């Protein structure tokens, strides 16, 4: 089959070579963006007097027809035409005749594909920002229900100090807020137009790059034509931001998996987000949480792959850069799917309040309260730490907890201990006293919730 660029060649490639080099199996994802960019380009060609108005109207009418078919999923693509750009150009020529071949005036596939990807990511990143905000709303709603639910806080996966469960949930809220900020910031760089940069050096036609940028809703243009067609930073930044977001979801998934186990029993994941075993009738597996955790590695891989592709490419465009798309598409699908699943999982999970609170009474996570108690009475903290460490050892040897020790044992360790030590040891008291800014005290958690609510209710 004759290539649209085949004039310089004496023979055509073998079919299997065409298949190896073709990107249409995956870049057809850009079909709507490609047509939208072409409509703006055609409009500009007319306004600048580069093409006659009657040609422009025919071209635009044909493109709008193709766009409608694309939205209905009625376009059929061919590997023979390599990529989305040549497929659309061939369809346009078939639709309106040879005048369709004038569309590519003053344009290269290099600036065309870059424009497509900017348009694509602008749309997808905006969707991801909204999905993050929806998940944040779910976290706030769940946190509001559990301000005074006490749960062990962990370091090294060992019980450390009792905390408000809402405080734990809000830790993820703020991680997600940073993610949302990063994606919002990235839109400044995504929303620049490379259209009109040509292959790399611009064009001799009197085009208006600012006009096409305006028509496509871009904030401005790339200032250097070589940079415009060479840049894939905006995709790498998207993949990097996505990797951090997925890392945060993965960490939370790890906790959900642990908490839903019989060893913890802190939560129960809703049946809609779990599966069973083909051999063990009793099993309820947290598969969706495990899948999100696993898919995080997939997103990391997409980031590393594109960094590796780009590290050795000289300016300007190289065919290597065709490898920028599959990882981008895959990451968009993975991130959007993970956010939707995760929000549903958190919204429907059952929190076993009694189990959580019972756990805080069967450990030594209140030991810091004893050290603080002595420090407040003038004992140097390191000395207080030593005293409490010995009391913990006594408990371990006796098989009891700190609240079980009689007052005379405390007084033997330090005469500064009084009867009020037992109130300080209560998990509820221990949590509520930690009212430093950003702490787990109930008043601080309620303040944090108010801030979080304002954030999620701001567009």
Swiss-Prot record:
Superkingdom to which the source organism belongs: Bacteria
GO biological process, one term: L-arginine biosynthetic process
GO molecular function per UniProt: argininosuccinate lyase activity
Pathway: Amino-acid biosynthesis; L-arginine biosynthesis; L-arginine from L-ornithine and carbamoyl phosphate: step 3/3
Catalytic activity: 2-(N(omega)-L-arginino)succinate = fumarate + L-arginine
EC number: 4.3.2.1
Membrane spanning stretches: none
GO cellular component labels: cytosol
Main localisation: cytoplasm
Keywords in alphabetical order: Amino-acid biosynthesis, Arginine biosynthesis, Cytoplasm, Lyase
Localisation per UniProt entry: Cytoplasm
Family annotation (HAMAP family): Arg_succ_lyase
Family (UniProt): Belongs to the lyase 1 family. Argininosuccinate lyase subfamily.
Name of protein: Argininosuccinate lyase
Organism: Geobacillus sp. (strain WCH70)
């Amino acid at each position: 089959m004759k290539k649209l660029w085949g004039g310089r060649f004496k023979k055509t490639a073998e079919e299997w070579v065409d298949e190896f080099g073709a990107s249409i199996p995956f870049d057809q994802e850009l079909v709507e963006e490609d047509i939208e960019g072409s409509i703006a380009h055609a409009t500009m060609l007319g306004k600048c007097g580069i093409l006659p108005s009657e040609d422009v109207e025919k071209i635009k009418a044909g493109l709008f027809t193709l766009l409608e078919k694309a939205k209905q999923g009625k376009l059929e693509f061919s590997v023979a035409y390599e990529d989305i750009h040549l497929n659309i150009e061939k369809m346009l020529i078939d639709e309106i005749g040879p005048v369709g071949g004038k569309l590519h005036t003053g344009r290269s596939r290099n600036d065309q594909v870059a424009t497509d990807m900017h348009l694509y990511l602008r749309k997808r990143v905006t969707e991801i920002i909204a999905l993050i905000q929806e998940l944040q709303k779910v976290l706030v709603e769940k946190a509001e229900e559990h301000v005074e639910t006490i749960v062990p806080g962990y370091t090294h996966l060992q019980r450390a100090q009792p905390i408000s469960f809402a405080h734990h949930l809000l830790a993820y809220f703020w991680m997600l807020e940073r993610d949302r900020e990063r994606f919002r910031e990235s839109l400044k760089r995504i929303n620049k137009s490379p259209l009109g940069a040509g292959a790399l050096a611009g064009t001799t036609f009197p085009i208006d790059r600012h006009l096409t940028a305006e028509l496509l809703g871009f904030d401005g243009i790339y200032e250097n034509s070589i940079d415009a067609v060479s840049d894939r930073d905006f995709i790498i930044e998207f993949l990097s931001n996505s990797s951090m977001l997925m890392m945060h979801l993965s960490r939370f998934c790890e906790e959900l998996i642990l908490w839903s186990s019989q060893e913890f029993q802190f939560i129960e994941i809703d049946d809609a987000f779990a599966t069973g075993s083909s051999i063990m009738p009793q099993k309820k597996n947290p598969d969706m949480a495990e899948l999100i955790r696993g898919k995080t590695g997939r997103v990391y891989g997409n980031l590393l792959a594109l960094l590796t592709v780009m590290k050795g490419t000289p300016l300007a465009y190289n065919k290597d850069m065709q490898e920028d798309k599959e990882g981008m598409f895959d990451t968009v699908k993975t991130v959007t799917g993970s956010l939707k699943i995760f929000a549903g999982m958190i919204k429907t999970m059952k929190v076993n309040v009694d189990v959580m609170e019972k756990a805080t009474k069967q450990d030594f996570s209140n030991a810091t309260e004893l050290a603080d108690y002595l420090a407040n009475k003038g004992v140097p903290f390191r000395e207080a730490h030593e005293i409490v460490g010995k009391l913990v050892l006594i408990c371990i040897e006796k098989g009891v907890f700190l609240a079980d020790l009689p007052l005379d044992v405390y007084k033997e360790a330090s005469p500064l201990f009084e009867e009020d030590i037992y109130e300080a040891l209560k998990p509820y008291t221990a949590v509520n006293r930690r009212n430093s800014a950003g702490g787990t005290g109930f008043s601080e958690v309620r303040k944090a919730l108010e801030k979080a609510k304002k954030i999620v209710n701001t567009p």
